[in-house]
């Protein structure tokens, strides 16, 4: 499965079977985490076989069950976009390995001793990880023209990027982002106003999807 195929196959999953993740798959995820942390200067950590973080659901949105593995998405205060970008890179790897995921902003507890924080670091969110009880369902799709600006008929490569971005997970499915095509191949991605927050993390996620669909070599970020 390619990353683009993983984008199309991935859906947020909140109910898990509890089936242990094979050590070979965990090692691949650990290797990717190490690469992402090194490249981005963030502090993603994998927690395995720990059920307490999701043992109670006090929020109405997104009740979880069976979660025993998750990624702690930690970094400095200004790391939000990188958290989204590199976190989604790991999410798509997990999808290619036959695993399911869900980005989680609120519906979890921080369990002491399961992760560490360096000075000035914080936990931005977590990502549930494991074998889903289902494969999830596609979130409602909004018209693509709401998510970009371009004076004229946009090129095919740009629209392929937009369609991939629309498949990205965002906080409460808010999709508060817009892509602007300037000149021939310069693209600006910007977050929009949101009461739910997490827009910078969402921006990193959708930018990664956009890059996978278009190819980083075919455009530059403005």
Regions found by a protein language model. Give the residues of each.
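Acidic, surface-exposed loops and disordered segments
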Residues: 1-222
């Amino acid at each position: 499965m390619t990353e683009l195929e993983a984008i199309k196959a991935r859906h947020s999953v909140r109910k898990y079977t509890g089936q242990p993740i094979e050590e070979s798959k965990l090692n691949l995820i650990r290797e990717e985490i190490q690469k992402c942390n090194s490249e981005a200067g963030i502090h993603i950590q994998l927690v395995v076989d720990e059920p307490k973080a999701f043992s109670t659901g006090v929020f109405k949105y997104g009740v979880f069950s069976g979660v025993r593995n998750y990624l702690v998405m930690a970094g400095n205060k200004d790391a939000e976009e990188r958290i989204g970008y590199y976190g989604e890179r790991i999410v798509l790897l997990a999808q290619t390995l036959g695993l399911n995921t869900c980005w989680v902003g609120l519906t979890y507890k921080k369990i002491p001793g399961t992760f560490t924080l360096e000075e000035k670091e914080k936990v931005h969110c977590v990502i549930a990880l494991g074998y889903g009880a289902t494969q999830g369902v596609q979130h409602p799709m909004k018209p693509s023209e709401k998510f970009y600006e371009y004076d004229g008929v946009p090129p095919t490569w740009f629209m392929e990027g937009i369609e991939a971005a629309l498949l990205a997970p965002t906080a409460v499915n808010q999709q508060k982002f817009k892509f602007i095509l300037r000149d021939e191949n310069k693209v600006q991605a910007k977050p929009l106003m949101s009461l739910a927050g997490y827009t910078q993390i969402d921006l990193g996620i959708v930018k990664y999807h956009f890059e996978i669909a278009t190819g980083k070599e075919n455009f530059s970020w403005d």
